[in-house]
């Protein structure tokens, strides 16, 4: 072999070093690929979990909202029924009160009619009271005075002549 060839031919140590460098590069490349794959899989799992959780959360929220809406409807229905019952009771009470007032008015009218009839019977059964009242002056009850009579007689005589 010539010197030129010997110089161009790498030594065993160099070849071994190059092979080790190639193996190291290959190993580093495989490790890096594995790391990327693990990171990618981890992200995919996390994102899948997030998406799944988001869907599940949305479904649970919808179910909870529907349940709350049904409870509100039930509460409204119960309040409506209790309001209707209360209104019915109030109406019955007002009807009873109106009936009681009407019966009281009718009883008062009957009592007034009875009293009027009694007064009429009493007034027709007793003799008519004298026209004179203790407060009034009656000219019929007064004794005639002679001076008035003479005065009126003389006035009449003078008028006649």
UniProtKB/Swiss-Prot annotation:
Biased composition (Polar residues): 1-10
Pfam family, one: CCDC50_N
Coiled-coil boundaries: 82-107
Disulfide links within the chain: none
Keywords tagged on the record: Coiled coil
Biased composition annotated in UniProt, kind: Low complexity: 144-161
InterPro entries: CCDC50 (IPR039303), CCDC50_N (IPR029311)
Disordered: annotated span: 1-20, 55-84, 118-161
Name of the protein in its database record: Uncharacterized protein R10H1.1
Provenance organism: Caenorhabditis elegans
